[in-house]
């Protein structure tokens, strides 16, 4: 049995945890000569969508997790790649007492409140520990089933995406590895991760790694954590189906644009 020391905090304590998230992406398709002129642009676009910074604000029972927005370079235009890579995270609200999560997010100009019960995750403690900054962290794991996704944007998407949409979704087992610290006794963490006896400072999930870079306990400026209310309430299952529909539309738009560019090139 693993014994973990728990520090005591007052019930009204607050904190802020800053995280950086990175998704591994297959970029082998960029070696294709047809993409040579746009390689720099595509690399920048991929980085924008796979390397992000987030802020988790928390108290003893509630938390909100949102992206720290970066200034966009003028002329970047519509970020079509956001339809392919990563999670559609707007602002995730988690309430450990009410056992509910709400993702306040936007898609195609419309706001949604993606609402679901907090997952009763069957974490397994390994007994391993390590330090992350000044905090002693302990390892916990669990296995979940997710839809298999191939993060590539070249000929695979252009030629095969339509056929892929007609096939049944392939589910695979993915091991989630988390490192949490009982020094901060809140059952929360980045993204949707929660359910451990301490704040999660690091988590890896297949192609995604999220790492805490800074923690501020009891900041001078207190933030009141509020339950999101902006948008249409929708279940996660229905929202995922809507995402798939819009993603397919974005793919078709991209393919049409490629055909027009190819036709223009032949006429010159």
What do the PLM-derived regions correspond to, one by one?
Residues 1-2:
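Sec-dependent signal peptide recognition
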Residues 12-268:
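Extended soluble regions of mature proteins
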Residues 6-10:
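Sec/Tat signal peptide C-region and signal peptidase I cleavage site
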């Amino acid at each position: 049995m693993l014994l973990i020391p728990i520090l005591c905090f007052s019930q009204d304590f607050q904190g802020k945890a800053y995280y950086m998230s990175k998704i591994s992406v297959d970029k082998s398709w960029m070696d294709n000569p047809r993409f040579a002129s746009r390689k720099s642009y595509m690399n920048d676009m991929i980085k924008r969508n796979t390397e992000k910074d987030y802020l988790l604000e928390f108290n003893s029972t509630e938390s909100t997790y949102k992206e720290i927005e970066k200034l966009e370079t003028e002329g970047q235009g519509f970020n079509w790649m956001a339809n392919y890579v990563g999670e559609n995270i707007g602002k995730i609200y988690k309430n450990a007492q009410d056992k509910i999560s709400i993702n306040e997010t936007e898609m195609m100009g419309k706001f949604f409140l993606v609402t679901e019960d907090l997952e009763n995750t069957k974490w397994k403690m390994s007994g391993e520990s390590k330090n992350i900054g000044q905090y002693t962290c302990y390892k916990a794991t669990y296995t979940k089933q997710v839809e298999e996704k191939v993060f590539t944007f070249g000929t695979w998407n252009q030629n095969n995406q339509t056929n892929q949409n007609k096939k049944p979704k392939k589910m695979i087992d993915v091991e989630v590895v988390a490192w949490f610290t009982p020094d901060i006794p809140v059952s929360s963490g980045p993204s949707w991760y929660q359910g451990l006896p301490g704040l999660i400072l690091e988590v890896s999930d297949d192609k995604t790694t999220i790492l805490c870079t800074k923690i501020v306990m009891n900041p001078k400026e207190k933030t009141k954590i509020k339950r999101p209310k902006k948008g249409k309430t929708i279940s996660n299952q229905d929202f995922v189906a809507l995402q798939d529909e819009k993603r397919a539309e974005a793919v078709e738009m991209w393919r049409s644009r490629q055909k027009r560019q190819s036709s223009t090139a032949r006429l010159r």
